[in-house]
Amino acid sequence: GDVYKRQGEEIKTNVVFYNFSEVGQNETERVVGGFNHYNDVLVGDVQFLSNNIAVAVGENVISIYKIKEYPSLEKEIQIDNTIDRVFFGTDYIGLVLDNSDSGELYKMVVYNFSGSKVCEAEFGTQVDNIQFDGSSVVMNNSTSFSVFNLKGKNVANMSFDMPASKVLPTGTRGEYILINTKYIQNIKLK
């Protein structure tokens, strides 16, 4: 979890790991690791992506922790642009960054759990939903839908006649369910 401590006028972030198994019972308050190197960066989200991997998302940093019995900081990724959104898959971490200073409005960057960059792509549309669908990234807003592969290539775009509230992957490659206020529709990409 994250703990914010006030020191004078500064706010310090500590990321603390607890272990409630037998390993943690010998530790004070079951704390098996703590990291306080974030200085003045706020860490707003910590996600466990598996039993062995946790990701801490700060204002301008992504920290990947490997956890065996005790956590260790595996990789830290410094982010130059403002992080607009973070999304997670079974094998990947995705970021949507503000890119308005250079080119399109947004940049999507995908990393694997080792912290290596897999791909990046720029796009100009505000998105309401973005998610991984296997080896693709699916994004939509109320009027359009796009699919990117993990090479950063835009492989599909679609516009909607009626505003869509959600586009859901079905688990079959290239097949999605479009939901709006009047109907649910299956979409198959060619």
Positions of predicted regions on the chain:
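Short loop/turn segments that connect beta-strands within beta-propeller blades
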Residues: 20-23, 67-70, 112-116, 149-153, ...
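Repeated scaffold domains used in trafficking and secretory/extracellular systems
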Residues: 34-49, 79-91, 122-135, 162-174
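Blade-level signature of beta-propeller repeat domains, shared across WD40, Kelch, NHL, RCC1
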Residues: 165-190
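Eukaryotic tandem repeat interaction scaffolds
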Residues: 56-129
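Short, small-residue-biased leader/transition segments that mark boundaries at the very start
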Residues: 1-4
